Swiss-Prot record:
One of its GO terms (molecular function) is protein-exporting ATPase activity. Residues 791-809 have a biased composition (Polar residues). The lineage of its organism: Bacteria, Bacillati, Bacillota, Bacilli, Lactobacillales. It catalyses: ATP + H2O + cellular proteinSide 1 = ADP + phosphate + cellular proteinSide 2. This is Protein translocase subunit SecA. It comes from Streptococcus pyogenes serotype M1. Its cofactor is Zn(2+). SMART domains: SecA_DEAD, SecA_PP_bind. Residues 827-839 have a biased composition (Basic residues). One of its GO terms (biological process) is intracellular protein transmembrane transport. Its main location: membrane. It is found in: Cell membrane; Cytoplasm. GO terms for cellular component: cell envelope Sec protein transport complex; cytosol; plasma membrane.
Length: 839
C-alpha cells in the first residue's frame, strides 16, 4: 500500500514538473506582451486564428496565447494570473481536472484555456451549476474575451430558440449543465434544421465538475409530455390507506431505503380495498400505487428529500447541494404519491419523449475538462468513465487553516447543545462562523436553538437560496453567524472582513459527516482561502445517519470500552476519524458501483439514441429527395412480410401476403392471390415491390413541386420515428425494471437488458419501416395539407396522415388476437398493430 501511495505521489510530482516548465515559458512572454499597445494585443486574436488555419496546433500556440490572456486580464480586470493558475489552465486545455483549493481563482484560471480553444472557431461551452454563476462569470470574464475580440453568449432557460441559437453561435457560451442537456434533447425533436440551436459539441469546461459529473451522474435529463390520466383518485385512496398503517404493518430496509407491506399490512390492504388476494395479476396497478404511497409516507421526508413551495408545489431537494431542483419530478408516480401525501394538487403523469444522463451527455464532447477543489477522492471514476486525470495544483500560499479532530457525542441532542455552546463562545469574541448541515431540517433546528440562545444569524438552504450570494459574501464579516446546507455558496468566495484574521479567521463547524468525504472537504474549504487563517471542527453523534447505517462494529466496541454513561460525554480520538473515513469510503464505493451500473444500462440506450439521432439529423438536414431511403424501407418491409410466412402452409402464406399487401401497400384491385400462386418468394417480393413503386410515384405526383415532396417525406419519416422512439424509451424503462428482478435468478440483469434491448431496437426499426411504408402508400394527400405540412416546426403529424393512420388500423382484416400480425413483424397481432384495437 505504501509503495502504491509513493508511486501516486511521484507521478503527481512528475506531472507538476512538466506543468511548471510550460508555465515558465508562458511567463517568459510577459514583458513582450506588456510592451504591446492595446490595439496590438487585441490583434493577437486574429493572428492566432490565421496561424491555426495555416496548420499550427493549439498546443504550439498555448504559451503565447496564455500570455496574451494574462496581460488582457491585467489591463481589463486588474488581475494577473499566478504561475499555479497557469498550470491549472494547462491541465484544463489537456482535457483533465486541476484540483484547485477554494479561493485559488479557478474562474480566472479558466480564461486561458477557454480563449485558446475558442481560437479554433468551433465553440467553447463553460458549464456552471446555476444561472447566477453563468451570468456572473459571463459578465466578469466576458469583458476579457470581448476586449480580445471574441463573442460571448449566455444560454438561459428563459431564452427563446432564436436567442439560444445566437448564444450557441458565439465563440464562448456560458450555460448550466441541465440547459445544455435539454437543448441537446430538444434539438433532436425538431423537424426543421433552422429550429435547432446547438452546434456540434466541441469543448466543455465544467465548473464544480465533481458536482455535475459525479453527484448528478445518475440523474437523467428527461423531456416528457403529459399523459391524460384519471388516476388521481387512486393516488389519494392509496395514500389514505397507508396512513391507517402502524409500524408493524410495513418493513423498511434502512441501508437501501426500500419498504414493503408486512403480512398484517397485506391483510389490511385486502380488507381496505375489498380484495381476496392483493397480489393477483389484475391488482398489479394497485400494488404499484400502494408501494409509492408507502415510500412517500415513510421513506421520503419533508424538508430533507423535498420541500413544499409557497404555491403548493413539491420541489425535490438535491442531497448533495441542498438546492431545490426546479422542474425536476420523481419518476414512476412517486412525485404524485408525495403530492397526495402533502394534500397539494396532483399533477398529471408524463411520458418520456427523450432522455439522457449527464454521464453520456458530456462524453459526447470532443474534449471535456473541469475544475473543482475536491476531486482526488473520485479519481478512479473520473479516469474510468470520462478518461480524465485529476492533477492536484499547489496553492499560491501555504494553507493556514487548522482542522481539529472530530468530536463524538452519544446523542443528537447533546451534540447540538455542544454546537450551540461553541457558536456562542466564538461569537462572543467576534469570530465569523459557518455552520454546515446535511439537511434543511437540521439547519432549521439549529436556527431555532440559536434564536433561543439570542445569537443573530443567517440561514442558507433550499428554501431561500435566491439570497445565496449575498449571504455568503457577508459570512466572513466580524460577528457573522451563517447556517448553510451543503450548497454553502459553492462558486462564491467568503472573504474575511476587517480584523477577522486576528480572531483566527472563519470557523467552519460541521454538524455531521456526509456520506462523501468530498462534500466534507468542500465545507472545510470554505475557510482558509489564499493562505487566510481559519478553523474547521466536525461534531458527530451515534445517532447520525452515517453512523447508524454504516458505523462499524469496531466503533461500537470502542465506544463500549469508553463507557459513555453521561449524555454530554465527548470523545476525541484519531481512531474515530479513521473509522468514519472508512465508513465513508464504503458508501462512496457503493455509490460508484451504482453509478457504474447506471452507465452500463444507459450505454444500451446511448448506442440506440445515437443511431436514431444521427439518422434523424440526416433527414432534417437533407436537401435532397429522400425517395431512395423510403423505397429501401418499402423493400425491407415487403421482404419481412413475405419471409414471416415462408414456413406456413403455401395457401395460407399466399392469403396472408395478399392481406398484408391490400391493407398496407396497394389498393385491393392491384393484387390477388391468383397471380401470386406458383411464384417463388423472391418473385413475390419483386412483384409486390414493383406494384408498391407504382403507388409511390402516384402519391408523389399529387404534390405540387420537388420542395413539397421533400417536406412531405421529412415530416412523414420524422413523425413515425419520434412516435416509435418515444414508445421504445418507455418499453426500455419497463424492461429495465423487469430484468432487475432476474438478478435473484442468478442471471446478469445488465447482459439480459443488453440482449433484449437490442432485439427490441431491431423490432422498433422494423415497425418504423412498416409504418412509413403503410402511411406513404395510404395517405390521402391534399393541396392544403401540403402547405400546412411545410409550416410544421414540431414532430406533430399533418392531420390527414394521422387520421389516415388511424383509419388504416381500423381497416385491418379480421385477424385473431394470437395470429401473426400481417405486417410481417413476426409478433402476434395483439402485441403489434392490433394492440390499439384491443386496448
Amino acid at each position: 500500500m505504501a509503495n502504491i501511495l509513493r508511486k501516486v505521489i511521484e507521478n503527481d510530482k512528475g506531472e507538476l514538473r512538466k506543468l511548471e516548465k510550460i508555465a515558465k515559458k508562458v511567463e517568459s512572454y510577459a514583458d513582450q506582451m506588456a510592451s504591446l499597445s492595446d490595439r496590438d494585443l487585441q490583434g493577437k486574436t486574429l493572428e492566432f486564428k490565421e496561424r491555426y488555419q495555416k496548420g499550427e496546433t493549439l498546443e504550439q500556440l498555448l504559451p503565447e496565447a496564455f500570455a496574451v490572456v494574462r496581460e488582457a486580464a491585467k489591463r481589463v480586470l486588474g488581475l494577473f494570473p499566478y504561475r499555479v493558475q497557469i498550470m491549472g489552465g494547462i491541465v484544463l486545455h489537456n482535457g483533465d481536472v486541476p484540483e484547485m483549493r477554494t479561493g485559488e481563482g479557478k474562474t480566472l484560471t479558466a480564461t486561458m484555456p477557454v480563449y485558446l480553444n475558442a481560437i479554433a472557431g468551433e465553440g467553447v461551452h463553460v458549464i456552471t451549476v446555476n444561472e447566477y454563476l453563468s451570468t456572473r462569470d459571463a459578465t466578469e470574464m466576458g469583458e476579457v474575451y470581448s476586449w480580445l475580440g471574441l463573442s460571448v453568449g449566455i444560454n438561459l432557460a428563459a431564452k427563446s430558440p432564436a436567442e439560444k441559437r445566437e448564444a450557441y453561435n458565439c465563440d464562448i457560451t456560458y450555460s448550466t449543465n441541465s440547459e445544455v442537456g435539454f437543448d441537446y434533447l430538444r434539438d433532436n425533436m425538431v423537424v426543421r434544421q433552422e429550429d435547432m440551436v446547438q452546434r456540434p459539441l466541441n469543448f466543455a469546461l465544467v465548473d464544480e465538475v465533481d458536482s455535475v459529473l459525479i453527484d448528478e451522474a445518475r440523474t437523467p435529463l428527461i423531456v416528457s409530455g403529459a399523459v391524460s390520466s384519471e388516476t388521481n383518485q387512486l393516488y389519494i385512496r392509496a395514500d389514505m390507506f397507508v396512513k391507517t398503517l402502524t409500524s408493524v404493518d410495513y418493513v423498511i430496509d434502512v441501508p437501501t431505503k426500500t419498504i414493503g407491506l408486512s403480512d398484517s399490512g397485506i391483510d389490511k390492504a385486502e380488507s381496505y380495498f375489498n380484495l381476496s388476494n392483493l397480489y393477483d395479476i389484475e391488482n398489479v396497478a394497485l400494488t404499484h400505487f400502494i408501494d409509492n404511497a408507502l415510500r412517500a409516507n415513510y421513506i421520503m421526508l419533508l424538508d430533507i428529500d423535498y420541500v413544499v413551495s409557497e404555491d403548493g408545489e413539491i420541489l425535490i431537494v438535491d442531497q448533495f447541494t441542498g438546492r431545490t431542483m426546479e422542474g425536476r419530478r420523481f419518476s414512476d408516480g412517486l412525485h404524485q404519491a408525495i403530492e397526495a401525501k402533502e394534500g397539494v394538487r396532483i399533477q398529471e403523469e408524463s411520458k418520456t419523449s427523450a432522455s439522457i444522463t449527464y454521464q453520456n451527455m458530456f462524453r459526447m464532447y470532443k474534449k471535456l475538462a473541469g475544475m473543482t477543489g475536491t476531486a482526488k477522492t473520485e479519481e478512479e471514476e473520473f479516469r474510468e468513465v470520462y478518461n480524465m486525470r485529476i492533477i492536484p495544483i499547489p496553492t499560491n500560499r501555504p494553507i493556514a487553516r487548522i482542522d481539529h479532530t472530530d468530536l463524538l457525542y452519544p446523542t443528537l441532542e447533546s451534540k447540538f447543545r455542544a454546537v450551540v455552546e461553541d457558536v456562542k463562545t466564538r461569537h462572543a469574541k467576534g469570530q465569523p462562523i459557518l455552520v454546515g448541515t446535511v439537511a434543511v431540517e437540521t439547519s432549521d433546528l439549529i436556527s431555532r436553538k440559536l434564536v433561543e440562545a439570542g445569537i443573530p444569524h443567517e440561514v442558507l438552504n433550499a428554501k431561500n437560496h435566491f439570497k445565496e450570494a449575498q449571504i455568503i459574501m457577508n459570512a466572513g464579516q466580524r460577528g457573522a453567524v451563517t447556517i448553510a446546507t451543503n450548497m454553502a455558496g459553492r462558486g462564491t468566495d467568503i472573504k474575511l472582513g476587517e480584523g477577522v484574521r486576528e480572531l483566527g479567521g472563519l470557523c467552519v463547524i460541521g454538524t455531521e459527516r456526509h456520506e462523501s468525504r468530498r462534500i466534507d472537504n468542500q465545507l472545510r474549504g470554505r475557510s482558509g482561502r489564499q493562505g487566510d487563517p481559519g478553523e474547521s471542527q466536525f461534531y458527530l453523534s451515534l445517532e447520525d445517519d452515517l453512523m447508524r447505517r454504516f458505523g462499524s462494529d469496531r466503533i461500537k466496541a470502542f465506544l463500549d470500552r469508553m463507557k459513555l454513561d453521561e449524555e454530554d460525554t465527548v470523545i476525541k480520538s484519531g481512531m474515530l476519524g479513521r473509522q468514519v473515513e472508512s465508513a465513508q469510503k464504503r458508501v462512496e464505493g457503493n455509490n460508484y458501483d451504482t453509478r457504474k451500473q447506471v452507465l452500463q444500462y444507459d450505454d444500451v440506450m446511448r448506442e440506440q439514441r445515437e443511431i436514431i439521432y444521427a439518422n434523424r439529423r440526416d433527414v432534417i438536414t437533407a436537401n435532397r429527395d429522400l425517395g431512395p431511403e423510403i423505397k429501401a424501407m418499402i423493400k425491407r418491409t415487403i421482404d419481412r412480410a413475405v419471409d414471416a410466412h415462408a414456413r406456413s402452409n403455401r395457401k395460407d402464406a399466399i392469403d396472408a401476403i395478399v392481406t398484408f399487401a391490400r391493407t398496407s401497400l396497394v389498393p385491393e384491385e392491384f393484387i390477388s392471390a391468383k397471380e401470386l400462386r406458383g411464384l417463388k418468394d423472391d418473385q413475390i417480393k419483386e412483384k409486390l415491390y414493383q406494384r408498391a413503386l407504382a403507388i409511390y410515384d402516384q402519391q408523389l405526383s399529387k404534390l405540387r413541386d420537388q420542395e413539397a415532396i421533400i417536406e412531405f417525406q421529412k415530416v412523414l419519416i420524422l413523425m413515425i420515428v419520434d412516435n416509435k422512439w418515444t414508445e421504445h424509451i418507455d418499453a426500455l424503462d419497463q424492461l429495465r425494471n423487469a430484468v432487475g428482478l432476474r438478478g435473484y435468478a442468478q442471471n446478469n440483469p445488465v447482459v439480459e437488458y443488453q440482449a433484449e434491448g437490442f432485439k427490441m431496437f431491431q423490432d422498433m426499426i422494423g415497425a418504423i419501416e412498416f409504418d412509413v411504408t403503410r402511411t406513404m402508400m395510404k395517405a390521402q394527400i391534399h393541396e392544403q395539407e401540403r402547405e400546412r405540412a411545410s409550416q410544421r416546426a414540431t414532430t406533430a403529424a399533418p392531420q390527414n396522415i394521422q387520421s389516415q393512420q388511424s383509419a388504416n388500423t381500423d381497416d385491418l382484416p379480421k385477424v385473431e388476437r394470437n395470429e401473426a400480425c400481417p405486417c410481417g413483424s413476426g409478433k402476434k397481432f395483439k402485441n403489434c398493430h392490433g394492440r390499439k384495437s384491443f386496448s
